[in-house]
């Protein structure tokens, strides 16, 4: 018995470009009908965005993130909608009990994204270097599983996977093969915002601990504000798409240096350009309680 069964038919994709911002659902079979795929080549950088438990591709946070990407650059954004396998349509009071079922579907959804990637590379000549994955919560692990699968398929690695507060329950004590991991892409960027729904464990090439990785400012009391802290990862990253070098991470230590002393050589900016900075490892990121959450007073490093 799985109340939230997975099949390839239950996963849909919303494909957005600057020219076509319609929220239509596509499948592996119908994606060829999208204007962007009428030709056999597409040169745009591609970004997959994948939601988490009991969410969907049309949830406001992901709609806002997709818009920020299209405002920023000439991207092709694919919002992966796996809501049925994520237990989104289940009875509210029972949803939490269904979490293990949604968690067990993550590898299958990751394999699906890898299959779409294979089609993009082989049928539409999209270079792997042009495909980046962003996932929130369970969607972060899905992105990691996609990263493992494309390597198995002989496609090489994605240039980057961005894990927004990867889900802790069912995953935090797993080894690399059973969760998002730094070997899943050439660069794996992790943003930690909740130590209960997420995990404090380092998982990536860079791990950003926003406000120490828990109890995000503006989210209210600990525990009660846990969902707010968990989803804040999506909002932080969206602001970092809009405002370059908005949130600066300082190397994690007992006495982190102030952001004002940062230089490009030892600190790293959260966001799409993080991988252009030389430093890797764990970083502490102070944040404000309201958007755009910036900690840099306009400083760009």
From Swiss-Prot:
Pfam families linked to this entry: Lipase
Family: Belongs to the AB hydrolase superfamily. Lipase family.
Disulphide connectivity of cysteines: 4-87, 176-181, 219-228, 245-269, 246-294, 262-267
UniProt-listed InterPro entries: AB_hydrolase_fold, Allerg_PlipaseA1, Lipase, Lipase_N, TAG_lipase
Source organism superkingdom: Eukaryota
Catalytic activity: a 1,2-diacyl-sn-glycero-3-phosphocholine + H2O = a 2-acyl-sn-glycero-3-phosphocholine + a fatty acid + H(+)
Free-text tissue specificity from the UniProt record: Expressed by the venom gland.
Designated name of the protein: Phospholipase A1
Active site: 137 (nucleophile), 165 (charge relay system), 230 (charge relay system)
Top enzyme class: hydrolase
Coarse class of the protein's main subcellular location: secreted
GO cellular component, one term: extracellular space
EC number: 3.1.1.32
Task performed by this protein: Catalyzes the hydrolysis of phosphatidylcholine with phospholipase A1 activity. May act as an allergen and induce hemolytic activity.
Any GO BP: killing of cells of another organism
């Amino acid at each position: 018995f799985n109340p939230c069964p997975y099949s390839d038919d239950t996963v849909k994709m919303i494909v957005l470009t600057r020219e076509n911002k319609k929220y239509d659902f596509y499948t592996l079979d119908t994606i060829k009908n999208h204007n962007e795929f009428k030709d056999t080549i597409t040169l745009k950088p591609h970004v997959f965005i994948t939601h988490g438990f009991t969410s969907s591709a049309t949830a406001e946070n992901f709609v806002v993130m997709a818009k920020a990407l299209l405002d920023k650059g000439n991207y092709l954004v694919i919002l992966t909608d796996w809501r049925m396998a994520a237990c989104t349509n289940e009875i509210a009071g029972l949803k939490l009990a269904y979490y293990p079922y949604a968690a067990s579907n993550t590898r299958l959804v990751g394999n699906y994204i890898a299959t779409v990637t294979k089609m993009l590379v082989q049928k539409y000549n999209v270079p792997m270097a042009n495909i980046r994955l962003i996932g929130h919560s369970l969607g972060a692990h899905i992105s990691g599983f996609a990263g493992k699968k494309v390597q198995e398929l002989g496609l090489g690695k994605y240039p980057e996977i961005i894990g927004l507060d990867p889900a802790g329950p069912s995953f935090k004590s797993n080894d690399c093969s059973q969760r998002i991991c730094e070997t899943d892409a050439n660069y794996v960027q992790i943003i930690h915002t909740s130590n209960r729904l997420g995990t404090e464990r380092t998982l990536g090439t860079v791990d950003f601990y926003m406000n120490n990785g828990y109890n995000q400012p503006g989210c209210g009391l600990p525990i009660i504000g846990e969902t707010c802290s968990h989803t804040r990862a999506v909002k932080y990253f969206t602001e970092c798409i809009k405002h370059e070098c908005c949130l600066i991470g300082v190397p994690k230590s007992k006495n982190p240096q102030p952001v004002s002393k940062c230089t490009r050589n030892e600190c790293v900016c959260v966001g799409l350009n993080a991988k252009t900075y030389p430093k890797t490892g764990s970083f502490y990121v102070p944040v404000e309680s309201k958007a755009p959450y910036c900690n840099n007073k306009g400083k760009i490093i």
